[in-house]
A protein has these predicted regions:
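N-terminal Rossmann-like NAD(P)+-binding subdomain of aldehyde/semialdehyde dehydrogenases
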Residues: 1-109
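Substrate-binding/gating loop at the entrance of the active-site cleft, primarily
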Residues: 101-130
């Protein structure tokens, strides 16, 4: 399977999950983050083995040492990613917050409320833990 097909499948699944998460409770969203952290920790060895393959491929492709240093995952970096997911779960819930509210001259009450905006995709060269 080529990279474009894989990325398209992942993006489609992410979009579906984002719709589900947008209507989920705070507790459900926090649980997803905790499960992400748990899975990062549980699968650390597998992640590091896959990263080793990435590192070997990058070296073969002539990637600079500076970029290789940023691409490298260590157990500590994976654990830091897990901690980051747990830290996000501890933050105040950003959804449903009234950001601006005012009464208009015509009697209407205008509110700006924070809502989920969907999936953001990011392509990066290195630094998988950032």
């Amino acid at each position: 399977m080529d990279a474009t097909t894989i990325i398209t499948q992942i993006a489609t699944k992410a979009a579906s999950a984002s719709r589900t998460l947008s209507t989920s409770s705070r507790e459900e969203r926090d649980l997803v983050l905790i499960k992400i952290a748990d899975n990062l920790e549980k699968n650390c060895d597998l992640i590091l083995k896959a990263n080793q393959i990435d590192m070997e491929n990058a070296k073969s492709a002539g990637i600079s040492q500076a970029l290789l240093d940023r691409l490298l995952l260590t157990k500590q970096r994976v654990m830091d990613m897990a901690k980051g997911a747990r830290d996000i779960a501890k933050l105040p819930d950003p959804l449903g917050q009234i950001l601006i509210e005012r009464n208009l001259a015509n009697g209407l009450n205008l509110k700006q409320i924070s809502v989920p905006f969907g999936v953001v995709g990011m392509v990066y060269e290195a630094r998988p833990n950032v």
